Amino acid sequence: MCDFYARFEEYCKTPGVDSGKARSYANAIEYLCDYLEICEINAQGIAQIKSLENDICDKDSELYQDLLHFLTVRGQKSYLAKGYIKAALKYFFEFVK
């Protein structure tokens, strides 16, 4: 998985994509995968993330609140609270096409 996150970070730095937040977006996807217990980025993992995208972005959803608690315990809540996970998903789905 470390290789995937490194490649995703590099993708976020490429001209035309250049998110300006490559490291933060790679971390955001890593932390989301940790929460979802996704150990390999494959079709199943991508589909799982895609199916939960609305709940991940909805502050009123049970999943959002549970993810926020998970990240808070790990000292990483800003990745969700400040919108890094939501923003990273756009780049993630483009990257895994």
Predicted feature locations:
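Short terminal alpha-helical segments
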Residues: 1-21, 25
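Non-catalytic DNA-binding core/recognition domains of DNA-processing enzymes
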Residues: 17-97
